[in-house]
Amino acid sequence: MKIAILSDIHSNIFALEAVIAHFKRKSVDMVVNLGDILYGPIAPQATYERLRALEDEFNVVTIRGNQDRQIYEADEAELESNPTMAFIHEDLTSDAMDWMRALPFDRQLTDYLYLCHGTPDNDLIYLLEDVSS
C-alpha cells in the first residue's frame, strides 16, 4: 500500500496543490494528514475546501496539530493581538471550525503505524535529533 503523508500545510493552498499533483502521479492508495493544516496567512478556507474535496478522491485520514487546536481555542485577546489568527477566524466558516474541533489528537492506523503531531502525549513537543559525527 502506498501512503502519501502530509503535514504542516499551514494554509498554503499552492504547495498543497503541488503535493496533491505529485502523489496522484505516484498512484497512492491513502493520504495521511498529520495536522497543522489551516494556521497561516495564505488561504485557510480554500485549503480546508481542497482537503475536504480530496476525501472524494482518496481514503484520507486526518489528525489535528497543535496549531489547529490553537485556532479553535483562540480567545478575544489572542484575536486582538495576533493578526494572523484574526484573519484565519474571519476567513474560516463555521463548518471548517467544526471540522477542526472534531479531528482526533492521534490515531492507531495499523498495528505498526501510529499517527500523532508532536509526541504521543503532547502536540507541543517536537521530536528533534541531535546529530553529531
What does each of the following model-derived ranges do?
Residues K2-M97:
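Core catalytic region of metal-dependent phosphoesterases/phosphodiesterases
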Residues L79-S133:
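Acidic, His/Gly-enriched loop-helix segments that form or flank divalent-metal centers
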